Regions:
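Short alpha-helical Gxxx[C/S/T] motif in the catalytic ATP-binding
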Residues: 122, 126
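Short beta-strand/loop element within the Bergerat-fold HATPase_c
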Residues: 71-83
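Conserved glycine-rich
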Residues: 135-136
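Short conserved segment of the HATPase_c
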Residues: 96-108
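Short conserved segments within the C-terminal catalytic ATPase subdomain
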Residues: 29-38, 43
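Conserved micro-motifs of the catalytic ATP-binding
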Residues: 2-8, 41, 45-51
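A conserved beta-strand-to-alpha-helix junction within the catalytic ATP-binding
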Residues: 9-24
Length: 158
């Protein structure tokens, strides 16, 4: 993201459309590993930069595809939680070890034993996009008691 990103005007963004677009765009890649992606319908909206938010959810979903085993599943969901909107990308892959969770958002950080290609910048970019939108990312356990849920909390669009 360029230094002027934080100054671009925000618009009303449909979370449902965002999740549906990511599902549609990444299904062919997920299909190569027989991974199922589902995007739950949502009529929630937030104010933000649509292209940046799309990049954020795409990056998180792409990471989930990379780390989820053949035949796995990924769920894209959104829900209202008081004055916050939570967007979740959940998978049933191997998960992120507790010891690595605090560091995965550092630029160029790669967990030991990671066999997936990448440069270690993706989650740092995701975190920056969340910050620009006054959001926060939490890493939680994923589906079926394993895997990872990346939960981004945004202020409600009033």
């Amino acid at each position: 993201l360029d230094p002027d990103s934080a100054r671009r005007p925000f618009e009303r963004v449909s979370i449902g459309e965002l999740l549906s677009t990511v599902q549609h765009d990444l299904e062919p890649i997920a299909g190569e590993k027989s991974i199922t992606i589902t995007a739950a319908p949502s009529d929630l909206t937030i104010r933000g930069m649509k292209d940046a938010l799309l990049m954020m959810v795409t990056n998180l979903t792409d990471n989930a595809i990379k780390y989820t085993q053949e035949g796995g599943r990924i769920e894209l969901t959104a829900l209202q939680d008081g004055s916050r909107i939570l967007v979740r990308v959940s998978d049933n892959g191997p998960g992120i070890p507790e010891k690595d969770r605090a560091r995965v958002f550092e630029r160029f950080y790669r967990a030991l034993g990671t066999h997936v290609s990448g440069n270690g910048l993706g989650l740092a970019i995701v975190q920056r996009i969340a910050e620009i939108h006054h959001g926060h990312i939490d890493i939680k356990d994923g589906l079926d008691g394993r895997g990872t849920t990346m939960e981004i909390s945004f202020p409600s669009d009033s």
